[in-house]
Design a protein with these regions (language model features):
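Mixed-charge, Lys/Arg-enriched low-complexity segments
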Residues: 51
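Basic/aromatic-rich interaction segments and small domains that mediate binding to polyanionic partners
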Residues: 2-48
Length: 51
């Protein structure tokens, strides 16, 4: 995953906003919550790559 990628988990969409050696942060589009993507290692899928 890279910054700007659109990801999906159980029908919810999020944007990757930070990629570092110790964390990958995603912002959920429905409520703006920011979380570590490691919480969703199973089932988190890149929908659209920003390249």
């Amino acid at each position: 995953m890279q910054v700007g990628d659109l990801v999906e988990h159980n029908g919810y969409l999020a944007l990757v906003i930070c990629v570092a050696s110790y964390e990958t942060l995603i912002r959920w589009l429905d409520d703006g919550t920011v979380e570590d993507a490691d919480n969703y290692t199973i089932g988190l899928e890149v929908v659209s790559e920003s390249r």
